[in-house]
């Protein structure tokens, strides 16, 4: 398949996508038999078995998009599409002109070979996308759902290297401890921390490190009390018993210098961000567990997992990505939502390296090549490739053009990608 055919076919896909979006979904007309054949031939060469727009016009291009993304991230990614021969040929494409003449040329008035390189055209999006400066964007994100709605602490808990997951801790906490063991866990509406022990723990000061997942939380209207249950299971090695004569137990958090009481009817509101919880145990106990029960929300100015709002204090900067980033936004959101962001990024890094390798003679990665930007920052990657002084300039230009077409195709297909 020639470069020209790829360019014309992707322009055809964009026209189809707009046409389907604008129609009511009950009918799908306007494509000639030649158009169907051209698309079928293209996907046959990519080993893509079926095209979604033929079988179900209500989900235009979704199946096709999923298969294309699967192809990009599969073991075939270093195959036919990445070879020099695929991009060297300018043979006459076999795409029918009927649909292109009807739906594309009157709007664009540009040669088909330039369509994908001009992403500001109306066939990509039916309406103009508003431009947001980084400051405005950050402020809008700060008002977004993660900050304004309650969240369950157990949904934030993440199992990391050297740390047992939240639910597996239930069985561990139900097992009598061999020695003193501090713990910090979460369940619905509650965060629990303390020390398990078979022997008495003397009264005094104890410090608990707030893990990263909890450091982004604040709590309002919280009761703080001693307990011995976790997800309905009894915690072994702690006691919740007390008498009226017991000395008070208090604690402090980094964001509040006041001593906050434990085991009272007081309703407390505080932030868990910033470091450690310092507990002053008023009376000796054979192990103890403190529960914080209240309404938890994400800290807008602390959550590294969502948005840091750092851009509010930065000057707006423009990134020259030829507007391709705008059209990849939907795709990137889908990847993040289904946990495939890192997988796809790794695949694109391998794809880019394989593409460059195929242009070298003998095939190899050029010395000094190292990408510091993510795959969707096309202009930065192009700058890195064009800076390879030990590679012929014409070869560098071909690599960038080849990568641009692949990125453009991802922008076309990615808008309809759904993980399931």
Curated annotation (Swiss-Prot):
Please provide the Gene Ontology terms (biological process) for this protein. fusion of virus membrane with host plasma membrane; symbiont entry into host cell
Q: Write the record's keywords in alphabetical order, separated by commas.
A: Capsid protein, Host cytoplasm, Host-virus interaction, Outer capsid protein, Virion
* Source taxon at top rank: Viruses
Q: Name one GO cellular component term.
A: viral outer capsid
Quote one Gene Ontology molecular function term: host cell surface receptor binding
This protein's assembly is summarised as: Homotrimer. Homomultimer. Interacts with host peroxisomal glycolate oxidase (GOX). This interaction mediates its relocation to virus factories peripheral to host peroxisomes.
Protein family (similarity comment): Belongs to the phytoreovirus outer capsid protein P8 family.
Per its database record, what is this protein's job? Capsid protein which self-assembles to form the outer icosahedral capsid with a T=13 symmetry, about 70 nm in diameter and consisting of 780 molecules capsid proteins.
Q: What is this protein called?
A: Outer capsid protein P8
Gene source species: Rice dwarf virus (isolate O) (RDV)
């Amino acid at each position: 398949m020639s470069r020209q055919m790829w360019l014309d076919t992707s322009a055809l896909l964009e026209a189809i996508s707009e046409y389907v979006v604008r129609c009511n979904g009950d009918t799908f007309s306007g494509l000639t038999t030649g158009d169907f054949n051209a698309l079928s031939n293209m996907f046959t060469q990519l080993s893509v078995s079926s095209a979604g727009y033929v079988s179900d016009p209500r989900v235009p291009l979704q199946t096709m998009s999923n298969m294309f993304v699967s192809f990009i991230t599969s073991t075939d990614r270093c195959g036919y599409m990445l070879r020099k021969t695929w991009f060297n040929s300018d043979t006459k494409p076999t795409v029918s002109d009927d649909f292109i003449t009807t739906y594309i040329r009157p709007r664009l008035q540009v040669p088909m070979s330039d369509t994908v390189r001009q992403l500001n055209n109306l066939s990509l999006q039916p309406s103009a996308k508003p431009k947001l400066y980084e400051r405005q964007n950050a402020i809008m994100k700060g008002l977004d759902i993660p900050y304004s709605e309650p969240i369950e602490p157990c949904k934030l808990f993440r199992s990391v290297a050297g740390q047992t997951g939240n639910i597996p801790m239930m069985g561990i906490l139900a097992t009598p401890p061999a020695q003193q063991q501090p713990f910090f866990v979460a369940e619905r509406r509650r965060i629990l921390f303390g020390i398990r022990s078979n022997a008495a723990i003397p009264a005094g000061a104890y410090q608990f490190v707030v893990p990263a997942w909890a450091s982004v939380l604040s709590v309002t209207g919280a009761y703080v009390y001693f307990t011995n249950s976790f997800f309905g299971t009894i915690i072994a090695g702690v006691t919740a018993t007390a008498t009226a004569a017991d000395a008070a137990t208090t604690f402090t958090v980094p964001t509040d210098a006041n001593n906050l009481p434990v085991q009272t009817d007081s309703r407390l509101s505080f932030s868990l961000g910033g470091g450690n919880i310092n507990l002053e145990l008023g009376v000796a106990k054979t192990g103890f567990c403190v529960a914080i029960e209240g309404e938890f929300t994400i800290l807008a100015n602390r959550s590294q997992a969502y948005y840091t709002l750092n851009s509010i204090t930065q000057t707006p900067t423009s990134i020259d990505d030829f507007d391709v980033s705008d059209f990849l936004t939907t795709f990137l959101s889908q990847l993040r939502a289904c946990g495939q962001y890192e997988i796809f990024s790794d695949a694109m890094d391998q794809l880019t390296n394989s593409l460059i390798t195929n242009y070298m003679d003998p095939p190899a990665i050029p010395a000094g090549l190292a990408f510091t930007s993510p795959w969707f920052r096309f202009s930065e990657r192009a700058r890195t490739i064009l800076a390879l002084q030990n590679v012929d300039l014409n070869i560098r230009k071909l690599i960038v053009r080849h990568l641009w077409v692949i990125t453009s195709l991802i922008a076309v297909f990615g808008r309809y990608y759904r993980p399931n």
